[in-house]
């Protein structure tokens, strides 16, 4: 009934293939029709691989079996990947649309990519609570208004959460009165 939603990803590019683009992204972030349109317009074939968590993505990139042109890790993972030599600097001459990104997001990105050399903000989101009003009414539980509401005993066994260690820790930290950061 209750879940957390988080969506913050960054696009990282390299250019190692001429008529083929290898992309590694979160599941359900780009509709297949967009890829089809891109291929039709450019003549470039897209190999589009999916991952569900940063922790699933990281060892694949680290192993180097596939040389991806674009990888879409979350903010904290970019810093780890840069520190471990897994991301190349982006040639921004090949990314003219960076001019269309709100400077607010580029500034926020400096927290993990201080000179914005390795990433481009691609999506931005928040962590929140989604709930089924009807199910809560059946359980006699009021709609949650704060993270601590998730510890209501009547919700035991009824909560679903996105598979994200970082989000789970954030919820627990908030419950204990700490900053989510």
What are these model-predicted stretches?
Residues 67, 72-181:
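Extracytoplasmic ligand-binding site segments that recognize negatively charged/polar headgroups
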Residues 8-84:
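Early extracytoplasmic/lumenal segment of secretory-pathway proteins
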Residues 1-6:
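Hydrophobic membrane-insertion alpha-helices, especially the h-region
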């Amino acid at each position: 009934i209750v879940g957390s939603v988080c969506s913050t990803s960054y696009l990282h590019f390299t250019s190692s293939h001429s008529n083929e683009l290898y992309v590694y992204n979160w599941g359900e972030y780009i509709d297949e029709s967009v890829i089809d349109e891109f291929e039709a317009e450019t003549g470039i074939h897209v190999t589009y691989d999916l991952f569900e968590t940063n922790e699933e993505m990281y060892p694949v990139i680290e192993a180097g079996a596939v040389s991806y042109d674009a990888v879409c890790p979350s903010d904290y993972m970019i810093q780890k990947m840069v520190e471990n030599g897994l991301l190349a600097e982006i040639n921004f001459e090949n990314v003219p649309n960076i001019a269309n990104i709100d400077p607010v997001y580029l500034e926020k990105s400096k927290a993990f990519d201080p000179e914005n050399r390795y990433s481009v903000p691609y999506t931005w989101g928040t962590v929140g609570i989604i709930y089924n009003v009807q199910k809560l009414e059946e359980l006699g539980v009021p709609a949650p208004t704060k993270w601590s509401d998730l510890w209501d005993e009547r919700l035991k066994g009824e909560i679903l959460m996105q598979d994200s260690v970082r989000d789970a820790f954030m919820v627990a930290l908030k419950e204990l009165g700490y900053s989510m950061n």
